Amino acid sequence: MALYMYQASYTAKSMAAQLKEPQDPVEAIRSALEDVGAELVVTGFPFGEYDVLVVYEAPDDVTAASVAMAVAAAGEVKSAKTTRMLSGQEWLESLRKRRVVHSRNAP
């Protein structure tokens, strides 16, 4: 499965609702991901540009796109981005492939 990082900023309305009735959203996030065949790796709540960060594994980019669309449609976030991440093994493989590309294109 591929690894993805999802970052989002809550709307003022969503943040106000959370302040009024604090709830742990991790289980809801986990359940939503599992519904589409994805698996939660870690969730964090940074302060700064984004309010929530979710790292998850999904079978493909289409699944990751469906997660982002579902969150956007719920209207709870004002901005978000999904980043496809390489695993350590994928990173190493890309470094090795780069040598092949470089050697073929070297002057």
Q: Locations of the language-model features?
A:
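Residue-level "edge-of-site" marker
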Residues: 46, 84-85
